[in-house]
Amino acid sequence: MKVLELGWLHKINRTRRLYSLRRYYHVETLFNGTLVTGGRDQETTGFAWWSGNARLINLSGKLLGAHVAHAGLIVFWAGAMNLFEVAHFIPEKPMYEQGLILLPHLATLGYGVGPGGEVIDTFPYFVSGVVHLISSAVLGFGGIYHSILGPETLEESFPFFGYVWKDKNKMTTILGIHLILLGLGSWLLVLKASYFGGVYDTWAPGGGDVRLITDATISPATIFGYLLKSPFGGDGWIVSVDNMEDIIGGHIWIGTLEIFGGIWHITTKPWPWARRAFVWSGEAYLSYSLAAISLMGFIACCMSWFNNTAYPSEFYGPTGPEASQSQAFTFLVRDQRLGANVASAQGPTGLGKYLMRSPTGEIIFGGETMRFWDFRGPWLEPLRGPNGLDLNKLKNDIQPWQERRAAEYMTHAPLGSLNSVGGVATEINAVNFVSPRSWLATSHFVLGFFFFIGHFWHAGRARAAAAGFEKGIDRDDEPVLSLKPLD
């Protein structure tokens, strides 16, 4: 019994050493012991200076300051970059030739553009930049105030804004507030599109125009049908949306569901199964957020690369399939004028040189672009009939604006690499074009990927902490502690 007792004592002592409060002091080490700020040093919080907001996990007032300041930085970038793009903008050139990523978004919302996506007024873009800059100043002052002067914790003075991470009811209330704000943001787009000036619709007759969306799709079968589609091939899940009515209708549904979902989460308490299923800690919520924003990043990647309705080609440049199809169309127009019989001409493989049959029997463009046979674009659709491309329309109905747009898109394929070596390999050195679609798709894919890895990292740590076996490195025996200080 004595031996057993001593054995347990040894085990308890070792457990105290490994699993004491020091298990929250992870492997970060201050490089300079003088960097101590108001009780937010490593010894107090368990996190070194470069762990940033982790030092503020239990200081709700200071964490509020960090978040408000962060929002200020984001809005400042938006305003500054907006004004930078306005200052460099050349109205005579397409937006996608000028490396712009913010002005195309404003143009898509219907600001400053007219028929065909032509920019007729840059003043709204200037106003947008100034409004964001002023807003960022307000947020910046708020961030500084709450970081330096405001209360360290909010629970005592402002209980409505205070919280404890383990308080499941408070956490779902905060979730509900966020959902309502997101829902209101979604409805702002609906109101802009339906009542306040409209949005740019690339499918408007004659090559696109700004118009009011007065008949948004509210059929649940249509809207939720996108979610039930396959993400592969020509199905394309929600990325396949190809009209503004469905886009605005989708925002009506999303906005409404988020508002009602927010009210639900504010007025109810989490059910027992949810209390058991989730880890309820600050790091767990971080991991959930990272997973969600990772998914948004991957969806934005596919949307900006493939979709030419939400991301009109007039502003973002053609999609890959669109540039390929426009090349086939351009040479069909040229050779038809030179006397070629585009319906029967054969290419070197014996297949149709200009036109051929798709797997489903439709008439499609021939040649290498056959792989993009199911492409749909506003400059091409008027030339289709009940069975694919209409021969009679190709011979008699091609409009000058379609020729011009196809020629422009043909020479602006989204092929540039991100080190700004643009164009195809055979292009002359003077050509250096990188499509905004290349930038937006690759950047969102990379960011989505790293957020995904961050989700795994923080989810693993949160689950380990909840299970009680997150111990890190035993700092007492760490070799570096026996070495001489660098200074």
Curated annotation (Swiss-Prot):
Pfam families: PSII. The chain crosses the membrane at residues 83-107, 148-169, 192-214, 269-289, 305-326, 461-485. The keyword Acetylation applies. [CaMn4O5] cluster binds at residue 381. GO terms for biological process: photosynthetic electron transport in photosystem II. It is found in: Plastid, Chloroplast thylakoid membrane. GO terms for molecular function: chlorophyll binding; electron transporter, transferring electrons within the cyclic electron transport pathway of photosynthesis activity; metal ion binding. Coiled coil: none annotated. Keywords: Acetylation, Chlorophyll, Chloroplast, Chromophore, Manganese, Membrane, Metal-binding, Phosphoprotein, Photosynthesis, Photosystem II, Plastid, Thylakoid, Transmembrane, Transmembrane helix. Residues 1-28 form a propeptide. It comes from the Eukaryota. The modification Phosphothreonine is found at residue 29. One of its GO terms (cellular component) is photosystem II. It is a multi-pass membrane protein. Binds multiple chlorophylls and provides some of the ligands for the Ca-4Mn-5O cluster of the oxygen-evolving complex. It may also provide a ligand for a Cl- that is required for oxygen evolution. PSII binds additional chlorophylls, carotenoids and specific lipids. The modification N-acetylthreonine is found at residue 29. HAMAP family: PSII_PsbC_CP43. PSII is composed of 1 copy each of membrane proteins PsbA, PsbB, PsbC, PsbD, PsbE, PsbF, PsbH, PsbI, PsbJ, PsbK, PsbL, PsbM, PsbT, PsbY, PsbZ, Psb30/Ycf12, at least 3 peripheral proteins of the oxygen-evolving complex and a large number of cofactors. It forms dimeric complexes. One of the components of the core complex of photosystem II (PSII). It binds chlorophyll and helps catalyze the primary light-induced photochemical processes of PSII. PSII is a light-driven water:plastoquinone oxidoreductase, using light energy to abstract electrons from H(2)O, generating O(2) and a proton gradient subsequently used for ATP formation. Belongs to the PsbB/PsbC family. PsbC subfamily. NCBIfam families: psbC (TIGR01153). This is Photosystem II CP43 reaction center protein. The lineage of its organism: Eukaryota, Sar, Rhizaria, Cercozoa, Chlorarachniophyceae. The gene is psbC.
